[in-house]
Amino acid sequence: VVRLVGSEMCIRDRYIGQIPKWDLSKVRPAGAPLKTFGGRASGPEPLESLFEFCVTTFKNAQGRKLSSLECHDVVCKIAEIVVVGGVRRSALISLSNLSDDRMRHAKAGQWWEQNGQRALANNSACYSEKPDIGIFMDEWKSLYDSKSGERGIFNRESANKMASKNGRRVVDGYEFGTNPCSEIILRDREFCNLSEAVIRVTDTEESLMKKVELLSLIHISEPTRRTTI
């Protein structure tokens, strides 16, 4: 059983070299049926892999703070194991400073061979003001050289302006971000709730249109949703 401790204490212990022990013997075994959601359990192995990854990451950073890329990798590794019934249940986007060279090259070259967890996140540079043309072109060149199409570009100043047009404003210094697909302007800790209209073999054109109509009504009342058909 995993014993929960204060996050600050847990992080402090990792920095001073104290390695925790964990017992996953009561985690549902791989292949066990999931009655509520359906599908099969992943078993304790993914969680074991996550814990070992975190321990290794903190060991490598002993005596210093984690870098932005190390933090990114830990979050991506967590997302990698969030699987229910064989279905991935996570999506990420990392918005990094324009000057962050580590994140700029996170998906450069054959990154997937040693850091497959990075596939779980989209990466974008966050522009808070109009950059110098030289800096802007350097960023575009690094995007091209990476051969992955990343980092992308997220214009935070524009997001703040667009949000203000709808009566939303920056509160307590927390500026606006976006969802993993960069479709929706969100506040800190807000979320995008993906909903789907499932097409079944028994559906007719009329029943499918009814599904889409109901989804649209829901989304009018809750604008931070995204529809997939």
Give the label of every model feature segment:
Residues 1-6, 11, 219-223, 227-229:
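Single conserved hydrophobic/aromatic residue that forms the stacking wall/gate
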Residues 8, 12-199, 204:
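Active-site cavity-forming subdomains of large catalytic enzyme subunits
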Residues 192, 196-221, 225-226:
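Long, charged, mostly alpha-helical binding arms that flank functional sites
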